[in-house]
């Protein structure tokens, strides 16, 4: 079995990692990293899976692809590297977080505290070329992340938080008899006022986890990234 991640995700995703299609993706990415500026750096591609093992995952917040500017992408959806200014979508997430559960905003965008509690911060596409949003869409990452979504859905008792049309296109992969879907507009400034603000995804998520008999997420982030 190939060990790309280093936890139980390697077993869950083994049929994908051992496929010819994944080998093609691997060859493509090797050339991309050699010839272009690709984000995140190679060592952070699987960060979301590394921080949140399959057995511990109880929430999925699904993004589209990584941030495509320097010093932003860190392998977790919506999260940015320590010391990086907050992207507009994340500012809006923090605003809703405060309005929903009273979590105090912080001046960093490093969401590891959530990942450590079982929140899989998953982008559907795990890499992106500099300045080219969706530049690696359709190159093969979707077979990996779709397989992860399906495996979690089959196991059940997962809350899927789906913001915007792209994320909601994954709904057919999810068994809604065994899981909970929380959906709304995307937190982007272009759409946040059309249904993201006031959607209360964080309290609704914890209510669903309580119904599953699982511990709620403490959404309050530490004031600094070392905490």
Curated annotation (Swiss-Prot):
InterPro entries on file: UDG_fam1, Ura-DNA_Glyclase_AS, Uracil-DNA_glycosylase-like, Uracil-DNA_glycosylase-like_sf
A UniProt-annotated Pfam family: UDG
Gene Ontology CC, one term: cytoplasm
UniProt KW DNA damage keyword: yes
Entry's Gene Ontology BP terms: base-excision repair, AP site formation via deaminated base removal
Compartments it resides in: Cytoplasm
Role, per record: Excises uracil residues from the DNA which can arise as a result of misincorporation of dUMP residues by DNA polymerase or due to deamination of cytosine.
Protein name: Uracil-DNA glycosylase
Gene this protein is translated from: ung
